[in-house]
């Protein structure tokens, strides 16, 4: 009985230390999931009001005017700060039939915007001409979607403008988003996504992303994790966190990053974008990971149960090993000389 209690005490102490370390680490790292990040979110009411102002549609007197976060950052009567450019990427100029409607909806809604479709050849030439130090890493990516990811960061940093995935159609004009120095959209569970985003040229957030591409260019065992952590949404979400921690208090206007809520992104009458079938790069491992995310509570409970069972079995076997037993026995049976004999020695 004592032996079982001893084993369990060691097991509990080690796991308490590990769990405490993990909780403290994630509490410091994941501001993207914390309530204190709500100050970065663009309120839906603010966007609706901006669209009304830009469309010369005066809100009803009965409708309360929102308190604009933008008022303290930028005067909307002035010029927008993000250039009127739409960037998209594909392998060639021949866009798949299923995405032509989405592509055309963005072009038709923005006749006064410059439209650039970055093909694989154009992307590589752009990197070679403007950022030759990165070309070896660009060519070495094992998945083409990684190159599609990084080119959007480089062109937004270089030219500014708005990036839109080809599987995102446009429902609203983007004019009201051009008054924010950087806008990204919120997503679950990774913080922010990279399928739609906008930026002024040479913004420090995109500079930080580019600076970390070389360090993140490694394999993470599964294709889905490799893409997400090297160039995808997880990588820019972690860097979003890092960037926010480096900002002065209060930050300057051009340092700000604004976050678009899910309802303003898609699936509502006021949303900027419409949904088309996409995620063509997802493999079987992505399906497993996404299934786990949809059943996260069950996965966490099952994972903890499995972890505790296996870790207890490991500790039990370790404590029964002859090396540990020899150490414990030697400590317990170490003879103690009488005081008189100790003085003689």
Curated annotation (Swiss-Prot):
Membrane topology: Multi-pass membrane protein
Compartment list: Golgi apparatus, cis-Golgi network membrane; Golgi apparatus, trans-Golgi network membrane
TM helices/strands, residue ranges: 4-24, 220-240, 296-316
Pfam families in alphabetical order: Gly_transf_sug (PF04488)
Family: Belongs to the glycosyltransferase 32 family.
Cellular compartments per GO CC: cis-Golgi network membrane; Golgi apparatus; mannosyltransferase complex; trans-Golgi network; trans-Golgi network membrane
Glycosylation sites: 55, 269
Entry EC number(s): 2.4.-.-
Signal peptide coordinates: none
Species in which this protein is naturally found: Schizosaccharomyces pombe (strain 972 / ATCC 24843)
Example of a GO biological process term: mannosyl-inositol phosphorylceramide biosynthetic process
Alphabetized GO MF terms: mannosyltransferase activity
Record carries keyword 4Fe-4S: no
Record function comment: With imt1 and imt3, is required for the synthesis of mannosyl phosphorylinositol ceramide (MIPC). Catalyzes the addition of mannosyl to phosphorylinositol ceramide (IPC). MIPC is essential for cell morphology, cell-surface distribution of ergosterol, localization for plasma-membrane transporters, and lipid-raft-mediated endocytosis of plasma membrane proteins to the vacuole.
Main location: Golgi
Keywords from the UniProt entry: Glycoprotein, Glycosyltransferase, Golgi apparatus, Membrane, Transferase, Transmembrane, Transmembrane helix
Entry keyword annotation includes Transmembrane helix: yes
Protein name: Inositol phosphoceramide mannosyltransferase 2
């Amino acid at each position: 009985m004592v032996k079982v209690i001893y084993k369990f005490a060691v097991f509990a102490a080690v796991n308490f230390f590990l769990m405490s370390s993990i909780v403290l680490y994630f509490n410091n790292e994941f501001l993207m999931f914390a309530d204190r990040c709500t100050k970065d979110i663009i309120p839906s009411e603010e966007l609706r009001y901006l669209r009304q102002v830009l469309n010369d549609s005066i809100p009803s007197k009965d409708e309360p005017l929102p308190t604009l976060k933008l008022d303290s950052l930028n005067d909307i009567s002035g010029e927008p700060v993000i250039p009127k450019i739409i960037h998209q990427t594909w392998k060639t100029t021949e866009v798949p039939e299923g995405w032509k409607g989405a592509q055309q909806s963005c072009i038709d809604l923005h006749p006064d915007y410059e439209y650039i479709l970055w093909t694989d050849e154009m992307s590589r030439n752009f990197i070679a001409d403007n950022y030759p130090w990165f070309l070896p890493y660009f060519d070495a990516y094992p998945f083409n979607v990684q190159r599609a990811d990084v080119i959007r960061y480089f062109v937004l940093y270089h030219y500014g403008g708005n990036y839109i995935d080809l599987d995102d159609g446009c429902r609203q004009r983007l004019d009201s988003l051009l008054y924010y120095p950087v806008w990204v959209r919120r997503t679950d569970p990774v913080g922010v996504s990279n399928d739609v985003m906008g930026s002024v040229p040479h913004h420090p957030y995109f500079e930080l992303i580019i600076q970390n591409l070389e360090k993140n260019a490694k394999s993470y065992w599964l294709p889905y994790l490799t893409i997400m952590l090297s160039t995808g949404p997880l990588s820019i979400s972690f860097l979003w966190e890092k960037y926010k921690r480096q900002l002065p208090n209060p930050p300057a206007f051009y340092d700000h990053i604004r976050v678009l809520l899910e309802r303003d992104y898609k699936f509502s009458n006021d949303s900027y974008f419409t949904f088309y079938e996409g995620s063509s790069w997802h493999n079987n491992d992505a399906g497993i990971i996404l299934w786990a995310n949809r059943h996260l509570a069950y996965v966490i409970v099952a994972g903890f149960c499995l972890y505790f069972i296996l870790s207890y079995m490991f500790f039990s076997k370790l404590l029964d090993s002859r090396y540990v037993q020899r150490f414990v026995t030697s400590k317990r049976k170490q003879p103690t000389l009488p005081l008189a004999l100790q003085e003689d020695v």
